[in-house]
Structures are given as C-alpha cells and as structure tokens.
C-alpha cells in the first residue's frame, strides 16, 4: 500500500505560489530566456536557496508553470466534450487535438521551448509528451487500422515541437502554422490504406 505524499507546509505553499506568480510576470514582461533565477527570487521576495531547492533550475520552474496548463488540456482530452474529448470519431479527435495543441503551443511557446530543450532529448522524456503520443497512437490505430500508429503519432508531434514552431513563426503567422498542421493531420487520418 502506497502512502500519500507528504503535505506541503503552508509557508512552502505560499513561497511556491509567490515564485510561480513572480516568474510568470517576469517571463511575460521580458521573455523566459532573458529572466534569471536571481531576478525571480528577488521579485518573489524569497532567497535563492528557496528557489533552487524547490525548482532546481529554470527548466524546473518552467515545468511547474506548465503543469496546470498541461493538466487542463489532458482533462479536456480525457473527459471534455467531443470532438477533443470522447465520443467523436478517431479522425475528428486527432484533428481536434492538433488544433487544441497548436493553440496551447502558440500561447505558451517560450515556456514550452525552454522545457523541451532543457537537455538533449528533454522533449521526449517529459510526461506530457508521452501522454500526447499515447493519445494520438490510440486514435491513429483506430482511424488507420494496419498503419504504424506509434510511429505516425511521433511524426504528427514532430512539427509541434516548440523549437520548430518558434523558427517557423519567424516566417509566417500562427494561423498559417495551424492551417498547415491541420493539413498534416487530415493526411494522416484520411490517407491511403496501410499496406
């Protein structure tokens, strides 16, 4: 039997919230890469030791800021209304996921880029990536019986990498990115039969 995780002390919870609010404010105002952990600690009114013990480094702080946003999208996928949530055909759910994830990606692009590039291969070790991949693989297996759904899920997630989208947005706007990703999703779910 697993024990419940230890409860967070009230002062630790207050400090965590202060740090996250300070980081979100500074990141919005100056961009994630321009803000130091020292600046976050000063803005939050906590010591650097508190910040580093709690989050480790900037990528850990970014991951904490993304956590609630990722959980929200995951909940909408698992139990929200169709077509993103259950109850729609698999192909429609794939298209809805690509649209919802593109919106999420564009809104939190700087945070996602830092999280996904914290170390080589970091994107693929993030629990959220594994969730997105598994979700798409299940839907693609249903939409394209006989196709290599596992690989196709990776292929569909590849152009959704934050670093890639950052580079593409230098050349075109978010609407064009979203339209192109929709075409890719359509091709995967409506393409020729596997074989």
Features from the language model and the residues they span:
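Basic, helix-initiating cap at the start of DNA-binding domains
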Residues: 1-30, 34-43, 60-63
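Short hydrophobic/aromatic patch on the recognition helix
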Residues: 45-55
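Amphipathic alpha-helical packing segments from all-alpha helical-bundle domains
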Residues: 74, 92, 96, 103-107, ...
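Short linear capping/connector segments at secondary-structure termini
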Residues: 78-82, 113-122
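Amphipathic C-terminal alpha-helical segment
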Residues: 104-107, 111, 138, 142, ...
């Amino acid at each position: 039997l697993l024990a419940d995780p230890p409860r967070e002390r009230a002062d630790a919870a207050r400090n965590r919230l202060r740090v996250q609010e300070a980081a979100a404010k500074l990141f919005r105002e100056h961009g994630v890469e321009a803000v130091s952990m020292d600046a976050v600690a000063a803005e939050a009114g906590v010591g650097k030791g508190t910040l580093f013990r709690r989050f480790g480094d900037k990528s850990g702080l970014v991951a904490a800021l993304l956590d609630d946003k990722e959980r929200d999208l995951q909940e909408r996928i698992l139990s929200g209304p169709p077509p993103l949530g259950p109850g729609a055909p698999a192909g429609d759910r794939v298209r809805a996921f690509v649209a919802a994830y593109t919106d999420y990606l564009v809104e939190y692009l700087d945070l996602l880029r830092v999280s996904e590039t914290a170390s080589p291969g970091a994107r693929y070790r993030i629990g959220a990536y594994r969730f997105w991949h598994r979700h798409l693989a299940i839907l693609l297996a249903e939409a394209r019986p006989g196709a290599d759904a596992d690989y196709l899920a990776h292929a569909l997630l590849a152009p959704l990498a934050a670093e890639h989208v950052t580079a593409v947005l230098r050349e075109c706007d978010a609407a064009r990115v979203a339209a192109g990703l929709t075409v890719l999703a359509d091709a995967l779910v409506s393409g020729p039969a596997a074989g």
